[in-house]
Amino acid sequence: MPFSLDLTGKIALVTGGSRGIGAACVRMFRQAGASVVFNYRKAREAADALVSELGGEGCYAVQAELDGTGAEEALVRAAVDRFGALDILVLNHGIWPPHDQPIDTMTAEQWRKTLAINLDSVFALVKHGVAQMKRQGRGGHIVVVSSTAGQRGEAFHCDYAATKGAVISMVKGLSTELARDRIYVNCVAPGWVATDMTAAVLEQPETQRKILQVIPLGRPAKPEEIAAPILFLCTSHAGFITGEIFNVNGGAVLVG
Protein backbone atom coordinates (compact mmCIF):
# COMPACT_ATOMS: atom_id res chain seq x y z
CA MET A 1 0.00 0.00 0.00
CA PRO A 2 1.53 3.35 -1.02
CA PHE A 3 2.16 5.60 1.95
CA SER A 4 -0.19 8.55 1.74
CA LEU A 5 -1.96 10.40 4.53
CA ASP A 6 -4.96 11.02 2.31
CA LEU A 7 -8.30 11.83 3.94
CA THR A 8 -10.12 13.04 0.84
CA GLY A 9 -13.86 12.66 1.31
CA LYS A 10 -13.66 12.36 5.09
CA ILE A 11 -15.42 14.71 7.50
CA ALA A 12 -13.58 15.66 10.69
CA LEU A 13 -14.75 17.49 13.79
CA VAL A 14 -11.94 19.02 15.86
CA THR A 15 -12.68 20.61 19.22
CA GLY A 16 -10.67 23.55 20.48
CA GLY A 17 -9.59 24.18 16.92
CA SER A 18 -8.87 27.90 16.82
CA ARG A 19 -5.42 27.81 18.42
CA GLY A 20 -2.55 25.59 19.49
CA ILE A 21 -2.81 21.84 18.92
CA GLY A 22 -6.35 22.17 17.60
CA ALA A 23 -5.43 24.71 14.93
CA ALA A 24 -2.49 22.53 13.89
CA CYS A 25 -4.92 19.61 13.53
CA VAL A 26 -7.33 21.68 11.45
CA ARG A 27 -4.53 22.69 9.08
CA MET A 28 -3.17 19.16 8.71
CA PHE A 29 -6.56 17.55 8.18
CA ARG A 30 -7.41 20.10 5.49
CA GLN A 31 -4.03 19.54 3.83
CA ALA A 32 -4.81 15.81 3.83
CA GLY A 33 -8.08 16.47 2.00
CA ALA A 34 -10.65 16.21 4.80
CA SER A 35 -13.46 18.69 5.32
CA VAL A 36 -13.17 20.08 8.84
CA VAL A 37 -15.55 21.60 11.34
CA PHE A 38 -14.00 23.01 14.50
CA ASN A 39 -15.29 24.87 17.51
CA TYR A 40 -13.95 27.85 19.37
CA ARG A 41 -15.04 29.27 22.70
CA LYS A 42 -14.07 32.96 22.65
CA ALA A 43 -11.35 33.34 20.01
CA ARG A 44 -13.59 34.29 17.11
CA GLU A 45 -10.93 36.37 15.36
CA ALA A 46 -8.47 33.48 15.46
CA ALA A 47 -11.16 31.09 14.20
CA ASP A 48 -12.17 33.37 11.34
CA ALA A 49 -8.52 33.90 10.41
CA LEU A 50 -7.93 30.15 10.29
CA VAL A 51 -10.95 29.57 8.05
CA SER A 52 -9.77 32.38 5.77
CA GLU A 53 -6.23 30.98 5.70
CA LEU A 54 -7.54 27.60 4.58
CA GLY A 55 -9.70 29.06 1.85
CA GLY A 56 -13.12 28.87 3.47
CA GLU A 57 -14.52 25.95 1.49
CA GLY A 58 -14.05 22.70 3.37
CA CYS A 59 -13.49 24.42 6.70
CA TYR A 60 -16.16 25.70 9.06
CA ALA A 61 -15.95 27.26 12.55
CA VAL A 62 -18.67 27.04 15.19
CA GLN A 63 -18.85 28.89 18.50
CA ALA A 64 -19.55 26.38 21.26
CA GLU A 65 -18.98 26.28 25.01
CA LEU A 66 -18.23 22.63 25.70
CA ASP A 67 -19.05 21.73 29.30
CA GLY A 68 -21.45 18.82 29.05
CA THR A 69 -24.62 20.89 29.14
CA GLY A 70 -25.90 20.44 25.59
CA ALA A 71 -23.61 22.22 23.15
CA GLU A 72 -21.93 18.94 22.28
CA GLU A 73 -24.93 17.41 20.51
CA ALA A 74 -25.49 20.66 18.62
CA LEU A 75 -21.84 20.73 17.53
CA VAL A 76 -22.00 17.19 16.14
CA ARG A 77 -25.23 18.10 14.37
CA ALA A 78 -23.61 21.24 12.92
CA ALA A 79 -20.81 19.16 11.41
CA VAL A 80 -23.27 16.72 9.85
CA ASP A 81 -25.53 19.50 8.60
CA ARG A 82 -22.57 21.27 7.01
CA PHE A 83 -20.86 18.35 5.29
CA GLY A 84 -23.33 15.46 5.46
CA ALA A 85 -21.49 13.00 7.69
CA LEU A 86 -18.97 12.51 10.48
CA ASP A 87 -15.95 10.23 10.09
CA ILE A 88 -13.39 11.63 12.51
CA LEU A 89 -13.74 13.11 15.98
CA VAL A 90 -10.70 14.77 17.56
CA LEU A 91 -11.32 15.81 21.17
CA ASN A 92 -8.66 18.40 21.88
CA HIS A 93 -10.44 21.05 23.97
CA GLY A 94 -9.88 21.44 27.69
CA ILE A 95 -8.64 23.63 30.50
CA TRP A 96 -5.55 23.47 32.68
CA PRO A 97 -5.80 25.79 35.69
CA PRO A 98 -2.33 27.42 35.56
CA HIS A 99 -1.92 28.18 39.26
CA ASP A 100 -0.80 25.50 41.71
CA GLN A 101 -3.73 24.61 43.93
CA PRO A 102 -3.30 22.39 47.02
CA ILE A 103 -6.17 19.97 47.49
CA ASP A 104 -7.12 21.41 50.88
CA THR A 105 -7.73 24.85 49.36
CA MET A 106 -9.17 23.80 46.01
CA THR A 107 -12.77 24.93 45.71
CA ALA A 108 -15.59 22.63 44.72
CA GLU A 109 -16.35 25.14 41.97
CA GLN A 110 -12.89 24.68 40.40
CA TRP A 111 -13.17 20.90 40.69
CA ARG A 112 -16.58 20.82 39.02
CA LYS A 113 -15.58 23.26 36.27
CA THR A 114 -12.51 21.25 35.31
CA LEU A 115 -14.48 18.00 35.23
CA ALA A 116 -17.32 19.58 33.26
CA ILE A 117 -15.04 20.88 30.50
CA ASN A 118 -12.44 18.12 30.41
CA LEU A 119 -14.61 15.06 31.08
CA ASP A 120 -18.37 15.65 30.92
CA SER A 121 -18.07 17.26 27.50
CA VAL A 122 -15.90 14.40 26.23
CA PHE A 123 -18.59 11.92 27.28
CA ALA A 124 -21.27 13.94 25.49
CA LEU A 125 -19.26 14.38 22.30
CA VAL A 126 -18.34 10.72 22.13
CA LYS A 127 -21.95 9.71 22.83
CA HIS A 128 -23.39 11.78 20.01
CA GLY A 129 -20.44 11.27 17.67
CA VAL A 130 -20.63 7.49 18.01
CA ALA A 131 -24.39 7.53 17.46
CA GLN A 132 -23.83 9.37 14.18
CA MET A 133 -21.04 7.02 13.08
CA LYS A 134 -23.20 3.98 13.83
CA ARG A 135 -26.07 5.42 11.80
CA GLN A 136 -23.73 5.87 8.85
CA GLY A 137 -22.43 2.32 9.13
CA ARG A 138 -18.99 3.06 7.71
CA GLY A 139 -16.86 3.12 10.85
CA GLY A 140 -14.87 6.08 12.09
CA HIS A 141 -11.98 7.35 14.15
CA ILE A 142 -11.95 9.02 17.55
CA VAL A 143 -8.78 10.52 19.03
CA VAL A 144 -8.83 11.98 22.52
CA VAL A 145 -6.05 14.31 23.69
CA SER A 146 -5.00 13.38 27.22
CA SER A 147 -1.73 14.24 28.99
CA THR A 148 1.25 12.86 30.86
CA ALA A 149 -0.68 14.02 33.93
CA GLY A 150 -3.32 11.41 33.22
CA GLN A 151 -0.75 8.65 33.61
CA ARG A 152 1.48 9.77 36.46
CA GLY A 153 -0.64 12.41 38.22
CA GLU A 154 0.25 16.05 38.76
CA ALA A 155 0.79 17.60 42.16
CA PHE A 156 -1.31 20.70 42.84
CA HIS A 157 -3.40 19.96 39.73
CA CYS A 158 -5.37 16.93 40.89
CA ASP A 159 -8.51 18.12 39.11
CA TYR A 160 -6.77 18.24 35.75
CA ALA A 161 -4.91 14.96 36.26
CA ALA A 162 -8.12 13.20 37.29
CA THR A 163 -9.87 14.19 34.08
CA LYS A 164 -6.97 13.17 31.88
CA GLY A 165 -6.68 9.81 33.60
CA ALA A 166 -10.40 9.28 33.18
CA VAL A 167 -10.35 9.84 29.43
CA ILE A 168 -7.52 7.31 29.10
CA SER A 169 -9.75 4.71 30.77
CA MET A 170 -12.61 5.74 28.48
CA VAL A 171 -10.44 5.21 25.42
CA LYS A 172 -9.37 1.73 26.53
CA GLY A 173 -12.92 0.62 27.23
CA LEU A 174 -14.49 2.21 24.17
CA SER A 175 -11.89 0.74 21.82
CA THR A 176 -13.15 -2.73 22.71
CA GLU A 177 -16.81 -1.73 22.81
CA LEU A 178 -16.73 -0.10 19.37
CA ALA A 179 -14.35 -2.42 17.52
CA ARG A 180 -17.20 -4.37 15.91
CA ASP A 181 -18.50 -1.11 14.49
CA ARG A 182 -15.06 -0.38 12.99
CA ILE A 183 -14.79 2.74 15.12
CA TYR A 184 -11.18 3.16 16.19
CA VAL A 185 -10.58 4.90 19.52
CA ASN A 186 -7.12 6.09 20.50
CA CYS A 187 -5.46 8.67 22.70
CA VAL A 188 -2.53 11.03 22.24
CA ALA A 189 -0.84 12.11 25.46
CA PRO A 190 1.30 15.25 25.16
CA GLY A 191 3.41 16.73 27.90
CA TRP A 192 4.43 20.37 27.72
CA VAL A 193 3.47 22.00 24.43
CA ALA A 194 4.28 25.57 23.43
CA THR A 195 0.73 26.98 23.16
CA ASP A 196 -1.25 29.95 24.44
CA MET A 197 -2.39 27.84 27.39
CA THR A 198 1.15 27.21 28.63
CA ALA A 199 2.85 30.44 27.53
CA ALA A 200 2.61 32.24 30.88
CA VAL A 201 4.24 29.30 32.67
CA LEU A 202 6.93 28.55 30.09
CA GLU A 203 7.97 32.21 29.98
CA GLN A 204 9.10 32.09 33.63
CA PRO A 205 12.85 31.24 33.46
CA GLU A 206 13.08 29.21 36.67
CA THR A 207 9.86 27.32 35.98
CA GLN A 208 10.96 26.63 32.42
CA ARG A 209 14.29 25.28 33.66
CA LYS A 210 12.55 22.82 35.98
CA ILE A 211 10.15 21.72 33.25
CA LEU A 212 12.90 21.09 30.71
CA GLN A 213 14.78 18.96 33.24
CA VAL A 214 12.07 16.30 33.06
CA ILE A 215 11.80 16.27 29.26
CA PRO A 216 14.56 14.01 27.90
CA LEU A 217 14.45 15.78 24.53
CA GLY A 218 15.05 19.06 26.33
CA ARG A 219 12.25 21.24 24.96
CA PRO A 220 8.45 21.54 24.83
CA ALA A 221 6.65 20.19 21.79
CA LYS A 222 5.42 22.27 18.90
CA PRO A 223 1.66 21.97 18.24
CA GLU A 224 2.37 20.39 14.86
CA GLU A 225 4.31 17.60 16.57
CA ILE A 226 1.14 16.60 18.40
CA ALA A 227 -1.17 17.08 15.43
CA ALA A 228 0.88 14.81 13.16
CA PRO A 229 0.33 11.58 15.13
CA ILE A 230 -3.32 12.52 15.58
CA LEU A 231 -3.63 12.73 11.81
CA PHE A 232 -1.83 9.41 11.35
CA LEU A 233 -4.22 7.65 13.74
CA CYS A 234 -7.13 8.71 11.52
CA THR A 235 -5.73 7.23 8.31
CA SER A 236 -5.81 3.76 6.81
CA HIS A 237 -2.20 3.25 7.88
CA ALA A 238 -3.43 2.98 11.47
CA GLY A 239 -5.94 0.30 10.54
CA PHE A 240 -4.74 -2.15 13.21
CA ILE A 241 -4.34 0.37 16.04
CA THR A 242 -7.07 0.92 18.61
CA GLY A 243 -7.11 1.44 22.36
CA GLU A 244 -3.59 2.85 22.35
CA ILE A 245 -2.11 5.71 24.37
CA PHE A 246 0.42 7.48 22.16
CA ASN A 247 2.93 9.25 24.38
CA VAL A 248 4.06 12.25 22.36
CA ASN A 249 5.89 14.08 25.12
CA GLY A 250 9.60 13.91 24.43
CA GLY A 251 9.98 11.02 26.88
CA ALA A 252 8.67 13.06 29.81
CA VAL A 253 6.22 10.39 30.94
CA LEU A 254 9.17 8.09 31.64
CA VAL A 255 11.05 10.35 34.02
CA GLY A 256 8.54 12.69 35.66
Q: What name fits each language-model region?
A:
Residues P2-F3, D100, R152, L231, ...:
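Short C-terminal tail/terminal secondary-structure segment
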Residues A32-A49:
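Conserved glycine-rich Rossmann-like NAD(P)H-binding loop of the short-chain dehydrogenase/reductase
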Residues H99-I103, T107-L115, I211:
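Substrate-binding pocket helix/loop in short-chain dehydrogenase/reductase
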Residues V126, T163, V171:
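Active-site helix of classical SDR
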Residues S147:
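Residue(s) in the substrate-gating loop at a strand-loop-helix junction
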